[in-house]
Amino acid sequence: NRTQTNNPIYHLIADELRLAFSDSILYLDEDSFEKCYVSTPETMRFDSKIRMNIGRRSNVLNGEVLKGLNDKDTQRIIDKFQVKGKKKIHIKDSKPLAILLLGTVGAGKTTFLHYMRKVRIKEIFSNKEDKLTPHWLHIDFLDNPSESSIVDFIYKSILEYINRHPILSNQTFVFDAFREDIEAIKSGPLFLLSEEQKNSRISDFLYEQYKNIRPYVDKIISHITKTTSFFLVIDNVDQIELDDIQSRIFTESFSISRALSLNLVLSLRQSTFIKHKNSPAIDAFDFEIIQIDPPRISSVIAKRFALVKYMTSNKSGNFIAENGAKVALDDISQLVDIISGSVLGSEIGTRIEVLATDDVRLALRMTREFLERGYTSPGKAVQIFREQGRYLLPRHEAFRAILLGTELTYSESTSTIANPFDSNLAVTQMQLLRLYVLNVIVSYASDPAFRQIDGSVITEKLRTIGVGDSFTHRVLVDLCNKRFLFTVNHGEPTASSSFIPSRLGGYIAKELISNFTFIECMLYDTYIADAKTWGKLRDLSGKIESERDVIKRITMRVSRAKSFYYQMEKLISPLCSEAIIRGLPSQWCSNPLRERLPELRKELGRVLHSAKKTYQPKQDDTSKYFLDESV
């Protein structure tokens, strides 16, 4: 039960946190950017805690692929930019360069682009006053208004760049770009007019070209690319959810780049590239494929905290503690020490890594949100940190804040984490199908020989126990969309796809379904078909809201979690029992909720023990709270 929506210390470091943990660090200076950049990819292949193999998805190309986080490959990428950035490289038969950055959502494609431009190849673009200096235009499709067409947005962005550039907007350069047209007009239809009249008509002509945008941009860019290089960078295409729009951006970008002899750098999801890799538009380019593997999220967060600490050093401030006292801080960077010490190398840090599923952008957002709302006793934290030099903030508060995000109660539609207890199929018998299928695939992944499981196998086995193909398809699509599973080939999930579980899927099936905080959050958005159980949960929730005694309230919360868990176990049991009757392999017969019951009892016992230890005066009689020690 959340009684406080904001962390009392957040305002002291809010600006620095928002900047350092921003989804985009585009506006950081060169030094700060270099401090934030992580060049070490995630290499985990086996998670010992849940004893599951972490599968890897296949490459989208069989040929050579450069690794963006590999030192040798990075140098080769730099060499490519330098070669194409040389003066007067555009000979008649030369194809423009096309670089495709392929990676999963949040893998760091945008960060890699800015790192290359700001740090590794900055000298190529340093002298803007030189006509032969190459050009770099970064177009972010998150800035594209929905009513604007793709082509119009690209052309308007190029025009804005032209207007800002001291050389491209110069009247002499504009005249040179339109020289042939101007001379043709003068000697043709305007030959009878006076010089003043000719200049007036030519001005009208140029202004008309400018208003129409495309012909003006075509002339200016075509002229500059005769003598130097122009790199057009199309970014954040993968943030657009509609595949059709992604596909059109892909083809339109290639078309414009080919027409204007631009070097194209395009960020894409692998799935979008697969759909178009045989497109005729691609044949016009010399291809370089750069694979951006997700960096270690723990390293990313560590560097962001280091940047926050650097920016807050020697700043003073104060906040109102939970007891109403005003706490003054001579150096608010010690708050960063408390927070980072509670995240890095801790269970909280591991949870963020797992829940983000290699999505750095999501990991940064979750960290930012739980720091804003996740803690209720910062005064106590500061006091203990001053006395002992270390303090670990409560992990359950952080975990709840991560699950809830900006909301007060959990809803799958707003949370970054999906609900495994409700498949949303509108059939009570199929309510736990999402968790059942996930547990089966995670069980297979516990075998060292596991590589993948085919969708045809999943469909066949589920048919055996009475699950229709339509339900199977919907669940597989959901599990992939919710990041519990991945398709090996990056394509859409179908019966012909092969699947591997994500690390998040493994933790859901093997740990989180018996976690008290997780259960409490999930039950708020789970359908309860059994009227008796629903009535009990409703009554307990009402009593919890009105109860003021902390231990009584926690005891009732434990009882509510148990009732919910037992109801979910009853719903999944028929699927497991049918698999046993039909003689399916052991992976299909295991009941994850029954198997996790000992861990649930241990978890709830820990919660009750912690409540007594923290909130109950020693002289009180514990029996009056009716604590159920046998859970």
Segments from the language model and where they lie:
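P-loop NTPase catalytic cores that bind/hydrolyze ATP
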Residues: 109, 143-161, 228, 342-381, ...
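The catalytic "switch" region of P-loop NTPases
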Residues: 219-233, 237-342, 388-392, 401-403
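Winged-helix-like regulatory helical subdomains adjacent to P-loop NTPase cores
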Residues: 30-34, 45-53, 345-348, 358-453
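P-loop NTPase nucleotide-binding core
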Residues: 47-62, 91-234, 240-242, 299, ...
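Short acidic, S/G/P-rich loop/turn micro-motifs used as interaction or catalytic elements
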Residues: 107-108, 143-146, 237-244, 272-273, ...
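Terminal-proximal interaction/regulatory segments of ATP-powered molecular machines
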Residues: 439-631
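Walker A/P-loop-proximal flanking segment of P-loop NTPase domains
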Residues: 1-127
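Alpha-helix-centered segments that form part of catalytic cores
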Residues: 193-221, 325-354
